Amino acid sequence: MADNKSTLPGLPDINGTLNRSMTPNTGWEGPYDMSVHLHWTQFPPVTEEWHYIIGVYITIVGLLGIMGNTTVVYIFSNTKSLRSPSNLFVVNLAVSDLIFSAVNGFPLLTVSSFHQKWIFGSLFCQLYGFVGGVFGLMSINTLTAISIDRYVVITKPLQASQTMTRRKVHLMIVIVWVLSILLSIPPFFGWGAYIPEGFQTSCTFDYLTKTARTRTYIVVLYLFGFLIPLIIIGVCYVLIIRGVRRHDQKMLTITRSMKTEDARANNKRARSELRISKIAMTVTCLFIISWSPYAIIALIAQFGPAHWITPLVSELPMMLAKSSSMHNPVVYALSHPKFRKALYQRVPWLFCCCKPKEKADFRTSVCSKRSVTRTESVNSDVSSVISNLSDSTTTLGLTSEGATRANRETSFRRSVSIIKGDEDPCTHPDTFLLAYKEVEVGNLFDMTDDQNRRDSNLHSLYIPTRVQHRPTTQSLGTTPGGVYIVDNGQRVNGLTFNS
């Protein structure tokens, strides 16, 4: 009985054929040009209350998904500190969830639920199922790509900058799109089909018909669109956990041989990447929780007792799967520090009750990549080791106003990051002036207020990494104001240059 599809007597089914022999259960009323799979006619018609519950639920989930994912795309695309190659995957995932929410949820499913049947015709039923398939598959394929990226960054940090380049990330995203489309398009060519399901208010893959074509398509879809991606994701995160444990053990040894500040910087960087990996794992777990019941329903329908699949049993997993598109923005808002800060800057009223915590790590807020080499000064009164920094991140602002030239000869070359101001750079970025300037031989530029420093001695003040609060005048001795250098080298004290 479950091996056939049916239509209302005398009307064409989803594939344009006639089936006049089917006698539907009284009370099942399909749209004028749609087929109702014979499987669903063995059950009583769905009550009006359930249709309204689904309609209200999908409206809420759809609107939250649209607003949340639009926010994610905007924040990640317009925040410099978030525009890294790895975050392109996050943007792609948000775009996928946004389209999924806008097409497969609100408003099409909402309108059909309130009408208690699919009202948009056969063509739109197939397009609806196709879009749901493409962007549902794109979500899990993107999560697979994210797990691979996290594996490389965490376990092979030295090779990550060459392996996960922006160009390669773009290529991986193209592969994700192509694979998702290829897995969703066969029903248009007779391998499988898109038909109404459950409450007859939405359309999806035909997982009920047990012909050879339909069954092989469901198996291929299940393997390449669900099981294999989950295996890859699982392997990557297991390797990440093992890599983190090895890293913790190595840090115990490295800390004894490295300067405390350098060890802290390296550990801070690793912990930052690990935090991002935990966010990715959370998103993945939520996706699996949302879609696993739906995948199980399809398997039972094909290889188990199909009579278990009642309209309500099929509809509840569908509702859970639709909600997957709204999870990710919530996870980022609760767990991603940079996303929270950027969101607070643009829509502070969202944080009326809980302002994001500001961590004392200015370098993390501004810089994403940093290479450090050490050079020793020669023919200079300064005999300490000076750090040579090069930053690949763009600056918040660059100014030469108020610069004072020191007349004392120096013989070292240095790239420095200099900021000026009193406010926290995370909440008041416009008040900070940040510059990356190379100090030439014989020229030391002091990026500070000329008015405060014109008649005073010039002090080269070094502040250790991750210190972003401005010291008091008393702590600086005779130096009013102050120059703040965010660096990762040794601490240098007492270098005085007379103007």
UniProtKB/Swiss-Prot annotation:
Q: Which UniProt keywords apply?
A: Chromophore, Disulfide bond, G-protein coupled receptor, Glycoprotein, Lipoprotein, Membrane, Palmitate, Phosphoprotein, Photoreceptor protein, Receptor, Retinal protein, Sensory transduction, Transducer, Transmembrane, Transmembrane helix, Vision
What is one GO biological process annotated to this record?
Answer: visual perception
Name the SMART domains on file. Answer: 7TM_GPCR_Srsx (SM01381)
Q: What is its main location?
A: membrane
**Modified residue annotations for N6-(retinylidene)lysine:** K322
Q: How is it modified after translation?
A: Phosphorylated on some or all of the serine and threonine residues present in the C-terminal region.
What protein is this chain from? Rhodopsin, GQ-coupled
Question: Whose protein is this, by species?
Answer: Mizuhopecten yessoensis
- Identify the taxonomic lineage of the organism of origin: Eukaryota, Metazoa, Spiralia, Lophotrochozoa, Mollusca
Gene, per the UniProt record: SCOP1
